[in-house]
Amino acid sequence: MHLIVGLGNPGSQYELTHHNIGFIVVDTICKYWNFHSFSKKADYLITSGIINDNKIMLIKPYSFMNNSGIPVAKIQNFYKLSLDNIVVIHDDADLELGRIKVKKGGSSAGHNGLKSIDSFIGNDYWRLRFGVGRPEDQRSLADYVLSKFSNFYNVTPLVEKIAKNIHLMLQGDNTAFINLIV
């Protein structure tokens, strides 16, 4: 069993923002692979389904970004999941818009959602880093990541490719995964 966590913030004011790209990708995986609708739990939304004969759980923490580790730890502990079977999808301002990197372990690089997860389960889980870039104007990074994509349609094809090919990452074939989405 694998757990795919999409990071973001709950609420309509955060929809289609840079910081919510994890939610957007997880929603697209859910739709592409015909999972059931998300169910609301205390501090997260969850659904499950099958991708290439493997059971997959998708969650969207609803505890706000800075507390994402709480629901992730609950699920990891309940299902006794190995960190090898956890993938966290998150925005990365250090990567250009549309660049993707797959990484296991490492630091949070200042990302508060990752800091929270690290504090609860450690940092040796998989990350799918989705580049959102940095502001080209005078806005602070915080204001930028909480702003909506100016041209979301430019990001949509990449999100769809990730959803379609996520099974390769879950199988450990990160090279094929990256080659098919870029």
UniProtKB/Swiss-Prot annotation:
SUPFAM superfamilies: Peptidyl-tRNA hydrolase-like. It catalyses: an N-acyl-L-alpha-aminoacyl-tRNA + H2O = an N-acyl-L-amino acid + a tRNA + H(+). The record marks 9 as: Discriminates between blocked and unblocked aminoacyl-tRNA. TRNA binds at residues 14, 64, 66, 112. The record marks 91 as: Stabilizes the basic form of H active site to accept a proton. The active site is at 19 (proton acceptor). GO terms for molecular function: peptidyl-tRNA hydrolase activity; tRNA binding. The keyword tRNA-binding applies. One of its GO terms (cellular component) is cytoplasm. Its EC number is 3.1.1.29. Keywords: Cytoplasm, Hydrolase, RNA-binding, tRNA-binding. GO terms for biological process: protein quality control for misfolded or incompletely synthesized proteins; rescue of stalled ribosome. InterPro entries: Pept_tRNA_hydro, Pept_tRNA_hydro_CS, Pept_tRNA_hydro_sf. It is found in: Cytoplasm. Its main location: cytoplasm. Belongs to the PTH family. Monomer. Hydrolyzes ribosome-free peptidyl-tRNAs (with 1 or more amino acids incorporated), which drop off the ribosome during protein synthesis, or as a result of ribosome stalling. HAMAP family: Pept_tRNA_hydro_bact. This is Peptidyl-tRNA hydrolase. It comes from Wolbachia pipientis wMel.
